[in-house]
Amino acid sequence: MHFADFLAGSFGGACGVAVGYPLDTVKVRIQTQKQFTGIWQCIVLTIRKEGVHGFFKGMFLPITTISMTSSVVFGTYRNCLQALSYIRKAENTKLDVFMSGLAGGVAQVSVMSPGDIVKVRLQCQTESRHSVNPKYSVKPKYSGPIHCLLSICREQGLSGLYRGALPLALRDGPSFATYFLTYHTLCARLTPDGQKEPEWTVVLLSGGVAGMSGWAVGTPMDVIKARLQMDGVRGQRRYRGLLHCLTVTTRTEGLGVFFRSLGINCLRAFPVNMVVFAVYEVSVRVLRSAPLVS
């Protein structure tokens, strides 16, 4: 078993969160709140109402959880590749890469869902204790990640932490399959024959493009996931489930709403996944050179 990939994935994921969190907050608000009509309008209103602090609401828990989920994704991916190669007694194909990425994306949902719903709810909480404008000074519902986590458990039970888990799996399975296939293909194409490891410029470019392609696939289901996670926070629940949310959203807002945050997803994904893969590659090479880690 490749243990190094679990650790390296954890390091890469944590660094990626730190880089991309402000734009992730903007993305979630655009997806779930009609008052925000575009990227710059959302950024300006957030700064005016909440200050810079508004972009970092709920970041502590995602750094912890995404560190774990990224570990699961990369570790599962690498070990699935190893298993498929061993079973077939042959080199891995692109289909192997795709299926291993799919397995990694689905596997991490059980770990990711609780932290993700807390992240989304805190990001969509526009009331701020740190408001820079007194007229916007309204007490927020959640005082922080732990309070939000406990409030969800108290109001909805443990199952509330997994509201939106199905669309999360439907988002991350195909998204990570595309993600790893894109990275693998670009690295292979851009690395000269006979060279064992890709150059760092290739790693950075391939990681950035992989992130964008993964989000291009995952954005529509990401909208559904975010809406289900926010449903009922400000009153009565609107959606009965995934299909009902999909139907109502399409009927009332049109198909375009599923791609409203695609631009910011791609804008955020490129630098984030440059960092994720760069840190992952550095870490995995160092760890594999250590005598006790394979």
UniProtKB/Swiss-Prot annotation:
GO MF, one example: transmembrane transporter activity
Zinc found in the keyword field: no
Membrane-related topology note: Multi-pass membrane protein
Keyword Ribosomal protein attributed: no
A Pfam short name: Mito_carr
Membrane-crossing residue ranges in chain numbering: 3-23, 54-74, 97-117, 173-193, 200-220, 262-282
Compartments (UniProt record): Mitochondrion inner membrane
Gene3D superfamilies, sorted: Mitochondrial carrier domain
This protein's UniProt keywords: Membrane, Mitochondrion, Mitochondrion inner membrane, Repeat, Transmembrane, Transmembrane helix, Transport
Residue stretches of each Solcar repeat: 4-83, 95-189, 198-286
A GO term from the CC aspect: mitochondrial inner membrane
Range of residues in the leader sequence: none
InterPro entries tied to this protein: Mit_carrier, Mitochondrial_Carrier, Mitochondrial_sb/sol_carrier, Mt_carrier_dom_sf
Primary subcellular site in the record, as a coarse category: mitochondrion
PANTHER family: MITOCHONDRIAL BASIC AMINO ACIDS TRANSPORTER-RELATED (PTHR45624), SOLUTE CARRIER FAMILY 25 MEMBER 47 (PTHR45624:SF3)
Family to which this protein belongs: Belongs to the mitochondrial carrier (TC 2.A.29) family.
Protein name: Solute carrier family 25 member 47-A
The species this protein was found in: Danio rerio
Record gene name: slc25a47a
